[in-house]
């Protein structure tokens, strides 16, 4: 289960916060390549946010190459160069 403390900050949206936290976890190697991420509904429920917020964050990470999706399977972490802690 991925749980993040998200709070909307002035000038940013919840989707941007979630996107940044997921991206950081991927780059720091906390979420390893090939890992299946929670479904949009599951992550939304666990973090008290909307499915649309999760979808927006996931889609941005796909566009940037951090995630890839498999139809009817979900979202997975792509192989990216990890940053040192």
Kindly give the residue locations of the regions a language model identified.
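N-terminal basic, amphipathic alpha-helical segments
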Residues: 1-85
